[in-house]
């Protein structure tokens, strides 16, 4: 791999005096990207191979080159407004990524400056309130960014597509049909014709790095940047930042969720209708996401395993949907 990376880095550096591939990151991820921590000429970088067939999930299609260019443009925009987004490096031709063919796959190679920091995944009221302030700052700045490349698609459209995928396999399973009916109810409750689309990036805890002073030091995600309804995006963040036992846990805390809204100063932008939507948006974000759909399709032929799986996500949905009604 070192030789392959060195061949690509010739497009970025006039001279390469030293190169070390220090670590392969996020192995065996669903998106088939390759990600390495490297050191070139004594400086650390993130070397990312983004698969040309990459998709966030089947509901939203593949990530095109045009979208990737626009995503990088948005990161520059945020950096211009003093948001600590990871710095992307253009190649010597001035392009934001380099096209690479390897092992019968096509990739977009993106080189970024490495950021040292800590992921905080066990959320506390103080940390979450601090990040709520940061998220509000980012969203307010993002309101002025306009794009003709990104599509304005509601998360609800994605959930409907997931429902269609499940319904095609659910005819013989009573428990799954009941679950689908519950999901449809939440989609209906979360619907509004008054969407406020702003460009957002995925600010989940694994994409945010903190410094020793408990301040946000860096944001590293960029390939999920797109238009998102502001309230739908806010519900997505509350799902993540209400977790007190780590990102693999379904344990959430209403006090922590409320602390996020306090930091975000949500009271001065949310309408009564937005608060009504939150309960169902939270349910959908945790209990009808791509991980749920993928697992459901994988166990659908095993009745017992399917029932146990649905119960886990049914309980999760109940916890999420009651987060803000318990405060």
Predicted features and spans:
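All-alpha amphipathic helical-bundle segments outside canonical DNA-binding/catalytic cores
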Residues: 270-282
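Conserved NTP-binding catalytic cores of kinases and kinase-like/nucleotidyltransferase enzymes
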Residues: 1-89, 211-212, 327
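Conserved kinase catalytic-core helix
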Residues: 115-150
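Conserved structural core of kinase catalytic domains
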Residues: 93-127
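An alpha-helical support segment within catalytic cores of ATP-dependent transferases
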Residues: 9-13, 147-148, 159-201, 211-214
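Active-site acidic catalytic loop and adjacent metal/ATP-binding pocket
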Residues: 31-42, 46-48, 185-232
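Active-site activation/catalytic loop segments of kinase-like enzymes and analogous catalytic loops
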Residues: 231-269, 284-300
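ATP/Mg2+ or Mg2+-diphosphate-binding catalytic cores
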Residues: 289-327
């Amino acid at each position: 791999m070192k030789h392959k990376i060195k061949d690509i880095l010739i497009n970025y550096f006039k001279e390469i005096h030293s190169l070390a591939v220090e670590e392969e990151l996020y192995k065996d991820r669903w998106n088939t990207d390759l990600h390495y921590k490297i050191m070139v000429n004594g400086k650390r970088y993130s070397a990312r191979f983004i698969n040309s067939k990459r998709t966030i999930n089947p509901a939203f299609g593949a990530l095109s080159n045009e979208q990737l260019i626009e995503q990088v443009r948005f990161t520059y925009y945020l950096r211009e407004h003093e948001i600590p987004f990871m710095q992307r490096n253009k190649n010597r031709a001035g392009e934001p990524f380099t096209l690479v063919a390897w092992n019968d796959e096509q990739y977009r190679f993106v080189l970024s400056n490495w950021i040292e920091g800590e992921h905080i995944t066990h959320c506390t009221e103080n940390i979450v309130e601090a990040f709520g302030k940061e998220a509000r700052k980012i969203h307010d700045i993002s309101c002025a960014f306009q794009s003709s490349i990104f599509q304005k698609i509601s998360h609800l459209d994605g959930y409907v597509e997931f429902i269609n995928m499940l319904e095609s396999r659910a005819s013989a399973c009573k428990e799954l049909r009941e679950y689908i009916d519950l999901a449809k109810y939440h989609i209906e409750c979360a619907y509004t014709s008054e969407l406020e689309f702003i460009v957002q990036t995925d600010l989940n805890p694994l994409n945010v790095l903190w410094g020793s002073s408990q301040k946000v030091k860096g944001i590293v995600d960029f390939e999920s940047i797109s238009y998102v309804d502001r309230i739908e995006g806010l519900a997505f963040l509350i799902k993540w930042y209400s977790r007190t036992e780590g990102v693999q846990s379904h344990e959430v805390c209403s006090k922590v969720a409320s602390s996020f809204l306090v930091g975000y100063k949500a009271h001065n932008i949310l309408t009564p209708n937005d608060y009504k939507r939150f309960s169902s948006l939270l349910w959908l974000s945790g209990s009808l996401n791509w991980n749920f759909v993928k697992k459901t399709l994988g166990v659908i032929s095993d009745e017992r395993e399917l029932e146990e799986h649905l119960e886990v996500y049914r309980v999760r949905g109940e916890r999420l949907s009651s987060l803000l009604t318990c405060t």
